[in-house]
Amino acid sequence: MSINTLRIGTRESKLALWQAQQVKDSLETKSISPQLIPIKSDGDINLTKPIYSMGIKGVFTKALDIALLENRIDIAVHSLKDVPTQLPQGLILGAVIQRGSARDVLVYNEKPNLNAPATIATGSLRRKAQWLNRYSTHTIEGIRGNINTRLKKLDKSKRWNGAIFSAAGLGRIGLTPENSVNSVSYTHLTLPTKA
């Protein structure tokens, strides 16, 4: 019996690698030997500009999609919420993995009084709108980076009373958090491949 290597493209963040490892573990058999291929995305390189203002479709997926089209990888692991509604020509969604928790959570160093003015960090327009709808006296500031980077920024910040994170993302890197509207496809992982 011959063993086939399956090259799995993934972003380099701890969360992305964890997600890709779960896919790798589920695909490993006696005849398939998956290997992870980390690839840096535009969204991981530029950590200052808000994602919505970057003007790039698939800011976290484009580099992996190009690697698929160039046959450098066989499948990619994306968070489905990051995938553009129209895939690049030649790619299809090969699978969608079972959804994780769809909740958002507030992470803080000291529990803030949510009835008083506060400054909350998030890079998501959806989270910003949702939070300000409920807490109109609060101010929202932008934050960029992977989960670990954002947690470090929150820890060092003297301005922020807290930051909003994905419960599933925190859980996937080993941090388990304890009311929100979620974006379409939030917490779904998808595996694009060549058509």
Give the location of each predicted region.
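N-terminal hydrophobic or amphipathic helices and topogenic motifs
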Residues: 1-81, 88-91, 195
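Hydrophobic residues within well-ordered alpha-helices
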Residues: 68, 154-155
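Short beta-strand-to-loop elements that line the ligand-binding cleft
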Residues: 36-38, 138-146
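Conserved small/polar residues in nucleotide/adenosyl-binding loops
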Residues: 187-193
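Phosphate- and divalent-cation-binding pockets in alpha/beta enzyme and binding domains
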Residues: 18-19, 85-86, 130-131, 150-153, ...
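Short, acidic/turn-prone active-site loops that include or flank metal/cofactor-
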Residues: 98-102, 143-148, 169
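A conserved helix-loop-strand patch within extracytoplasmic ligand-binding domains
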Residues: 80-81, 89-137
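A ligand-binding cleft/hinge motif common to bilobed small-molecule-binding domains
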Residues: 81-87, 155, 160-179
